Regions:
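Bacterial N-terminal signal peptides
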Residues: 8-16
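N-terminal hydrophobic or amphipathic helices/low-complexity stretches enriched
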Residues: 20-63, 70, 78, 299-303, ...
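Soluble metallo-hydrolase cores and metallopeptidase-like ectodomains found primarily
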Residues: 24-26, 107-109, 113-139, 240-324, ...
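Second-shell loop/turn segments in exported
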Residues: 27-35, 49-59, 96, 125-131, ...
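Noncatalytic luminal/extracellular "stalk/propeptide" segments of secretory-pathway proteins
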Residues: 45, 49, 53-186
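Metal-dependent peptidase/peptidase-like ectodomains
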Residues: 103-107, 145-146, 156-157, 252-254, ...
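Zn-dependent metallopeptidase/amidohydrolase metal-coordination segment
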Residues: 206, 433-489
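His/Asp/Glu-rich mid-to-C-terminal helical/loop segments that flank catalytic regions of hydrolases
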Residues: 246-249, 253-256, 264, 339, ...
């Protein structure tokens, strides 16, 4: 019996030793691939330059999703498109042009939010400043037809609120301005009688205060001042309204113009100079509803197939640019990590899921759908590695004390990739479990108590990257990527995801949240 036990123990030792040796060989192979055959920038190139900006409901989003499926299949992963929801109409953005004709002639630098109207071909017209009172509207109503109208405020990327709630707010402000005018008449009479110089009350402003009336009068479009770099989001009211159909879409363009050009044009209008603006904006809609899907690829676990490690990013991106950073920095390294793992012959003990979420920019829609559909899996997720930030490389992690030893062991090979790139595991204190969604897909999982420990990143080479410059702006381009950072990120992601998947036990959640 003793001899049999010794033989069994020896076999177990050999088996475990062989498995450990095999995994070490896989990690070395991943590092080699990362150095000699790293294709992360190819993935980002296709995603951002061949497909471009890709909001849900667009052809670009659907085409990018199909491309991801094709790539994953070619690498040997299991992959599927999983329906996550639908949107009432679709939207495809074409090119846009504009110019000032006359004195101070110049090309115009502008954007329009997604899901807003384009022009009816090339349209040219004079320019007016929007009215603030009934009297001002009456004075100019005969000139509104065929005019471009400058509206108040500074753009935050959204169009004028054309909803019933927006109409209600505008009606309220109009009434308040009527009362202000009455009080100003009293102030005028008082000043005239007494010789005092009591200041008049300021009228309240609201972008597009006479929006409905101006649309009915036949304006060509609205123009609002916007800080540079220009930011353009989407028509949230249209997308979220269940009553939206192809037949009730707003038909007047909503233009966000470079603040410096806006100031010049506004001054020219105030000085009553003669000039025109010309725009050609090719924004196109699709009949809906349009379904959108999460792209889910997987490497099935060899020992714990019903336990999971998630690597994720979001596939959708605003189309004012091409989503080179937001979220090319998530999708590119995720795809390349999957390719590296397959090419290196990885056979993880746990299933690794590679998830490209839909609709993050419209409110984490794909992540919410995944959590709802797969609620039974939430307790079996070791960690979610979600990347949705800049191109900076991983330089460490903050983890609960109960995970510290595991992550120190898992990440030990990371320092072999590039000695000039630091990587350190540090202990973090328990935090309150979030109760509301934040700005990323990871927040949806965190609310459910799932570990969403991400990498600490840093611009260690000092390449002067500024996330705010690209965040939902015209500069979110492929060229804003830093190739060496992205290549390192893909390699680190592959190694760490595999390491977590190969632990003998699921990562402890002790000390993760204060319950």
């Amino acid at each position: 019996m003793r001899k049999i036990l010794m033989i069994c123990a020896a076999l177990a030792f050999l088996t475990n030793g062989t498995a450990a040796f095999a995994q070490d060989a896989v990690v070395k192979k991943i590092i080699e691939i990362g150095k000699t055959d790293n294709q992360v920038m190819h993935q980002i190139d296709i995603l951002t330059n061949r497909f471009g900006g890709r909001p849900i409901g667009s052809d670009a989003f659907e085409n990018a999703a199909e491309w991801m499926v094709r790539e994953y299949k070619s690498w040997g992963l299991d992959v599927k498109l999983e329906e996550a929801g639908s949107i009432p109409v679709g939207f495809n953005r074409g090119p846009w042009f504009g110019r000032l004709i006359g004195e101070n002639s110049m090309p115009l630098h502008f954007v329009t939010p997604s899901y807003t109207s384009g022009t009816k071909g090339v349209q040219r017209g004079h320019v007016l400043i929007e009215p603030r009172t009934d009297e001002e509207f009456a004075q100019m109503k005969g000139r509104l037809k065929g005019a471009w109208v400058l509206i108040s405020g500074t753009s935050r990327g959204f169009p004028i609120d054309h909803s019933a709630a927006g109409d209600s707010l505008r009606s309220k402000i109009k009434e308040e301005n009527r009362e202000i005018l009455k009080k100003n008449e009293e102030i005028w009479a008082h000043n005239r009688k007494t010789g005092e110089h009591k200041e008049y009350l300021k009228l309240k402003e609201q972008p597009g205060l006479y929006y409905r009336e101006m649309c009915e009068a036949g304006v060509l479009g609205f123009i609002q001042s916007a800080p540079v770099p220009l930011r353009a989001l989407y028509d949230r009211r249209l997308v979220e309204n269940p009553n939206t159909t192809f037949d009730n879409i707003p038909e007047v363009p909503d233009i966000k113009l470079d603040e410096h050009q806006f100031a010049i044009i506004k001054q020219m209008v105030e000085e009553r100079r003669t000039f025109e603006l010309e725009f050609d904006i090719r924004n196109h809609f699709k009949l809906g509803p349009i379904k959108y899907h999460n792209v889910i690829a997987s490497i099935k676990g060899s020992k714990y197939p019903d336990e999971y490690v998630i690597v994720s990013g979001h596939l959708d991106a605003y189309d004012v640019a091409t989503g080179g950073i937001d979220c090319g920095t998530g999708i590119g390294p995720m795809m390349e990590a999957a390719r590296m793992l397959m090419k290196a012959g990885a056979k993880p003990k746990r299933t690794i899921l590679f998830v490209a979420f839909a609709g993050e920019e419209f409110g984490q829609l794909g992540a919410q759908a995944w959590v709802k559909t797969h609620s039974d899996k939430l307790g079996k997720i070791s960690n979610m590695f979600n990347r949705d930030g800049g191109p900076e490389p991983p330089v460490g992690m903050y983890v609960p004390k109960a995970m510290y030893d595991d992550f120190v062991k898992i990440t030990a090979p990371v320092k072999q990739i590039r000695p000039d790139y630091p990587f350190e595991i540090r202990i973090r204190e328990p935090r309150k479990r979030p109760t509301e969604y934040g700005g990323t897909d990871a927040s949806v999982f965190a609310v459910e108590g799932v570990p969403t420990l991400g990498f600490v990143t840093d611009d260690i080479k000092g390449y002067d990257f500024d996330y705010d410059e690209i965040w939902h702006t015209e500069r979110d381009l492929y060229t804003k990527n830093i190739p060496e950072y992205q290549e390192h990120t893909a390699t680190v992601t592959a190694i760490v995801a595999l390491g977590v998947a190969n632990l003998d036990k699921q990562l402890s959640r002790e000390g993760l949240y204060i319950e």
